[in-house]
Amino acid sequence: MNETVFTNARLITPDAVVEGTLVVRDGRIVSLDNGASSLAERIDLEGDYLMPGLVELHTDNLEKHFIPRPKVLWPQGVPAFFAHDAQIVASGITTVFDALSVGEYHDKGRIAMLGKAVGALNSCRSTGKLRSEHLLHLRCEVADPRMQDLFFPLSDTPALSLVSLMDHTPGQRQWRDTSSYRTYYSNIA
């Protein structure tokens, strides 16, 4: 049994901020009490705030670390992934669904990045050194004829927890017409 006691904390609950003590046992909150704890084995937060971690269900932040500028693919996946993890945990996010695009319309480098990003995710998770829990969200672009061929090799990835179907076809809610689509992509190069 692993137990951690946080005391003298401002605990953020769904209804209020209370001053008190929080006990975590085996990774789960087991009690929240008003007042300080007198236990010898405790962490005194000296009035600092303590809140549950946030869950991010969809972020494109990982792609920004692999493609920091248009047409630039970061050469090493693991350092890019750890940089992403540092930003995520610094934001208070303890569980993140890293969204990766499976398919694209314009060569923005996402296809080249896809396998590298999933490989880095698997490598980093296996080290046990990630500070947030990273799960995989594959966004399958239905209008890309390569989508199925890209998706199936990734479908048995242990971290895969969410799959969504996306339709960014011009005129289908993403752009009001083909002219808007052309304007958007003319600014990428």
Language-model features, listed with the residues they occupy:
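Short, acidic, Ser/Thr-enriched surface-loop or helix-capping motifs
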Residues: 6, 24, 44-45, 56
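Divalent metal-coordination and catalytic microenvironments
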Residues: 9, 27, 47, 58, ...
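Conserved acidic residues
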Residues: 3, 40, 94, 161
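Active-site metal-binding motif and surrounding structural segment of the metallo-beta-lactamase
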Residues: 36-51
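Metal-coordinating catalytic core of metallo-dependent amide/deamination hydrolases
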Residues: 103-107, 112-189
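N-terminal metal-binding scaffold of metallo-dependent hydrolase/deaminase domains
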Residues: 1-38
